[in-house]
Amino acid sequence: MRIRAFIITLLLFTLPTMVLAEFNPTAYYTVDDQAMESTDFINDAQAPLTVTFKANPSNLGNTNPAYEWRFTKEGSQEPFMVRYEEETTFEFVESGSTSVALYVTYDSNTEPELISTIKVSISISLLEMPNAFSPNGDGVNDIYKAKDNHKSIIEFHAYIFNRWGQKIYDWTDINGGWDGTHNGKQVAAGVYYVLVKAKGSDGRKYNIRRDVNILRDYIEEGASNNP
């Protein structure tokens, strides 16, 4: 009786405990300087978009899993890229949808197991430039820049010329602009010329040429006249 009890006790204390590894694949990215994260999809994002994918494993115990992040474009059966890290970063610069699937292999004798898929959708491009601005210090429309509805512009270069064809300013940041000055001094009110060369994530090339009117005496409705 004692021997049987000893054997049962020994078995209870020597049987291995099953630990189930868990993963929580998550995409981390930034929109307008705000940190964002998603476990299922990123919808209608603007390019270029840098996303860090993390497997976020837990309860691994003695398990040392191998990771595969498979990047597949919508409509394709095969991934265009595979990454083999627990955490990987990718910059999306093309319009369309991409599925990012995390597969995990626990040992050399098992097939990769699909954990989950995160879908990233990049919008088509859009770029428009206004034909006037009023750099009068009222805090409204003081900077000449691309309209706020721009989307997925991955290359951008804008040039400002005066009436004699002389370049007086240029910028390459889609969120930048011109304050109506040249060499630190305000330019005269009147008509100037903008040339914009840009490229969208969908491959569309922009070659925008138009007049730009400086309206220094114009006060936007609702703006304060105080300095």
Residue ranges of model-derived segments:
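Beta-strand-rich extracellular modules
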Residues: Y103-D107, K197-K199
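Proline/serine/threonine-rich low-complexity linkers at boundaries of modular beta-sandwich domains
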Residues: V19-D33, K119-S123
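Short loop/turn motifs at secondary-structure boundaries
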Residues: D40-I42, A47-P57, K119-P227
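Conserved Ig-like domain signature around the intradomain disulfide
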Residues: G96-V104, G190
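Bacterial Sec-dependent N-terminal signal peptides
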Residues: M1-P25
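Solvent-exposed segments in extracellular or luminal domains encompassing
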Residues: P79-S99, G177-D179
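Solvent-exposed loop segments of extracellular immunoglobulin-like
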Residues: N59-E68, I154-E155
